Amino acid sequence: MRIHYLLFALLFLFLVPVPGHGGIINTLQKYYCRVRGGRCAVLSCLPKEEQIGKCSTRGRKCCRRKK
């Protein structure tokens, strides 16, 4: 029965996100960008695009064509 506590503790340590990584947040931001009709740009948006948000905590921009 004690092994269950050890396994639970190890599972918990693997599921806790690393500070600064933001894996779940980045995934949600990318999904929200796609829902709004945008794309994730690495550096900046193209000249005929406008920035409508962010795709990650590290600075990727969500861009879509200007209306």
Curated annotation (Swiss-Prot):
N-terminal signal peptide: 1-22
Which GO terms of the cellular component aspect does the record hold? extracellular region; extracellular space; Golgi lumen
User: Where does it primarily localize?
Assistant: secreted
Name of one Pfam family that matches: Defensin_beta
The record's annotation in SUPFAM superfamilies points to:
Defensin-like (SSF57392)
What UniProt keywords are attached to this protein's entry? Antibiotic, Antimicrobial, Defensin, Disulfide bond, Secreted, Signal
One Gene Ontology molecular-function label: chemoattractant activity
Tissue specificity note: Highly expressed in skin and tonsils, and to a lesser extent in trachea, uterus, kidney, thymus, adenoid, pharynx and tongue. Low expression in salivary gland, bone marrow, colon, stomach, polyp and larynx. No expression in small intestine.
Q: Where in the cell is it found?
A: Secreted
- What are the BP-aspect GO terms? cell chemotaxis; defense response to bacterium; defense response to Gram-negative bacterium; defense response to Gram-positive bacterium; killing by host of symbiont cells; killing of cells of another organism
Induction trigger: By bacterial infection and by IFNG/IFN-gamma.
Q: Which cysteines are joined by disulfide bonds?
A: C33-C62, C40-C55, C45-C63
Which family is this sequence assigned to? Belongs to the beta-defensin family.
Main role? Exhibits antimicrobial activity against Gram-positive bacteria S.aureus and S.pyogenes, Gram-negative bacteria P.aeruginosa and E.coli and the yeast C.albicans. Kills multiresistant S.aureus and vancomycin-resistant E.faecium. No significant hemolytic activity was observed.
Q: Which PANTHER family does this entry report, sorted A to Z?
A: BETA-DEFENSIN (PTHR20515), BETA-DEFENSIN 103 (PTHR20515:SF0)
**Mind telling me what this protein is named?**
Beta-defensin 103
Organism of provenance = Homo sapiens
